[in-house]
């Protein structure tokens, strides 16, 4: 039996609101028999009614009863398929948020013949019933999990179909390219070149560029989705842990005058300017014979490589120490595409002339026109300027642009597969391989892109993997 039909037989039910005690909970019922199974449990103005005749999308105040037991007073709303989230008949029951009440209503529904929904089953049905494509369905999970404005905006773009439109356009271009090449296979006896080779390669190049742009956006998209990784680095005792505590507004890291106090990385997140940042306080890098501290330093090096933004902290009162400047210079030289913000800490005791001199020294040492930010992590000075700089970095990164950003690891992998298939086709073209072999790679690229939106999905295992990560009531 086709996966499009085997999963949609039962009428399912689940709590659609978050677990725990609350003022209100919503229980969702969906399936062909939703109205028939809920009707015996619901009394409207003291009488049982046939919910199939209820006015769609109209709230009804009544009672949920089972075997003469009043379970709760509820607000019930009916949605007639296909005009519902799942495109099936749907009933939503808003009850009091008691754990007992939720459980009793679910028990009553199951006694009537409903089945408890699996994780993501409502959204899965919406996809299988054509209410949304697969990438939009995955966006639902991202919207639910979003913690910041940027995460929410990125997921909403995907849900509203812009992402799917871009992918479908790419797929159509690939189909056109394949069609032009396969014409020669259909008419081998004709000594005619159906497609100009130069035009074919130009079209292939255009598609590759579009794919690469989407692939390259994944680093930013993944960072926004999971929290932009920011490493706080510097030699020992420059105030890295104090800076983390000040940013977070709590004593997250131990602060001490003893060198090497931070022996492991400490991570925490906070929202700044609509973005979620994941700060990592690293152990101060220095030569040490302490085994535990050495392990912490190695982990710090790893976290620095993973970071998208580096906060390089120096102690403004000890700037003459060569190891401070040498260490920051090494980080600067190895930063690659990462953004580095230079922070001069303990600046509360520095005169204006000293600040100017320090700024010039650091700019000369790093061969950069970028000026450092002077802060006092202990007193909170300069922290607002730092937060503004972090926000500005993200604003100019493209995170808020209209361009689509890939944030889903599955999508990224499939886009890479499509890109690699096109590269193989291009290489085979240059080697003079036959048209039938070239079109195999094109078909692979088409399938990979189609799997993102669900147009090429044939495996139930793939759908199970995707929707198993949803919560029960979605």
From Swiss-Prot:
Q: Which domain of life is it from?
A: Bacteria
What Gene3D superfamilies does the annotation carry?
P-loop containing nucleotide triphosphate hydrolases, Probable tRNA modification gtpase trme, domain 1, tRNA modification GTPase MnmE domain 2
Check the record and name the InterPro entries matching this protein.
G_TrmE, GTP-bd, GTP-bd_TrmE_N, GTPase_MnmE, MnmE_dom2, MnmE_helical, P-loop_NTPase, Small_GTP-bd
List localization entries: Cytoplasm
Q: Which cofactor does it need?
A: K(+)
Name all TrmE-type G domain ranges.
227-395
Enzyme Commission number, as recorded = 3.6.-.-
Q: What does this protein do?
A: Exhibits a very high intrinsic GTPase hydrolysis rate. Involved in the addition of a carboxymethylaminomethyl (cmnm) group at the wobble position (U34) of certain tRNAs, forming tRNA-cmnm(5)s(2)U34.
Assembly and partners are described as: Homodimer. Heterotetramer of two MnmE and two MnmG subunits.
UniProt-listed NCBIfam families: mnmE_trmE_thdF, PRK05291.1-3, small_GTP
Q: What is this protein called?
A: tRNA modification GTPase MnmE
Phylogenetic lineage: Bacteria, Pseudomonadati, Bacteroidota, Bacteroidia, Bacteroidales
